[in-house]
């Protein structure tokens, strides 16, 4: 369903409308931070994002054009991640500290940390009493204190 018309997406909407043309846009965690520029939807339709600054695209967000003729659903892409766990909560906290000290993005869950797969990080983690497992999962890192979002 490729259209020749230039599709400019400008707004977030709260609910998925029943009528209109719907497109899906699958993005990784880095791409979900960029609110402006050209993108290719899952069906290879080029769109232009011109969203207001100061936000972030989230899994399930619905975007629309000014004329509300087109809607784009944001889908979080599955990424290669490292799942970090430990029997010691203190060791997990120390690991989180060292990852943060290196400005590594981390998703924090109840008993695990998740970060993007990287051999340098994996080598660093060998110095801690943690278990690491390579997994495929959607990644939702914490927003940092110095975030510009």
Swiss-Prot record:
It is found in: Cytoplasm. The keyword Chaperone applies. One of its GO terms (biological process) is protein-containing complex assembly. Its main location: cytoplasm. One of its GO terms (cellular component) is cytoplasm. Keywords: Chaperone, Cytoplasm, Nickel, Nickel insertion. InterPro entries: UreE, UreE_C_dom, UreE_N, UreE_N_sf. SMART domains: UreE_N. GO terms for molecular function: nickel cation binding; unfolded protein binding. NCBIfam families: PRK13261.2-2 (NF009756). Involved in urease metallocenter assembly. Binds nickel. Probably functions as a nickel donor during metallocenter assembly. Belongs to the UreE family. This is Urease accessory protein UreE.
């Amino acid at each position: 369903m490729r259209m020749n018309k230039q599709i400019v997406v400008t707004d977030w909407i709260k609910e998925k409308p029943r009528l209109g043309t719907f497109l899906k846009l699958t993005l990784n965690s880095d791409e979900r931070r960029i609110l402006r520029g050209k993108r290719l939807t899952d069906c290879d339709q080029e769109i232009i994002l011109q969203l207001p600054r100061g936000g972030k695209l989230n899994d399930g967000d619905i975007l629309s054009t000014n004329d509300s003729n087109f809607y784009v659903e944001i889908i979080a892409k599955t990424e290669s991640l490292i799942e970090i766990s430990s029997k010691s909560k203190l060791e997990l906290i120390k690991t989180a500290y060292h990852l943060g000290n290196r400005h590594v993005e981390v998703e924090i869950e109840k008993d695990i940390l998740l970060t993007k797969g990287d051999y340098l990080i994996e080598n660093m983690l060998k110095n801690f009493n943690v278990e690491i497992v390579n997994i495929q999962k959607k990644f939702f890192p914490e927003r940092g204190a110095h975030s510009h979002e």
